[in-house]
Amino acid sequence: MAFDKKLLEIVACPVCKGTLILNKDSNGNERLVCRFDRLAYPIEQNIPVLLETEALVLSSEELEKIK
């Protein structure tokens, strides 16, 4: 079961309160990305883990690949 895209309308980045983008990492795992803060929040068992301590900081190169 995939992440429900309707939730993108109500979830926000916990750091800046900005928009999150649904994306897949290089292993095909879904994650939510904040382009402003360059953070990728994991999605575990279809539940987004919106904790700054669990987020992955994205490099400029990784961020450019995300549309």
From Swiss-Prot:
Write down the InterPro entries for this protein, in alphabetical order.
Trm112-like
Query: GO cellular-component terms in the record?
Result: cytosol
Q: Report the leader peptide range.
A: none
Which ranges form a coiled coil? none
The source's domain of life comes to: Bacteria
Family assignment from sequence similarity: Belongs to the UPF0434 family.
Q: Which HAMAP family match?
A: UPF0434
**Protein name, per record:** UPF0434 protein Patl_1782
Native organism is Pseudoalteromonas atlantica (strain T6c / ATCC BAA-1087)
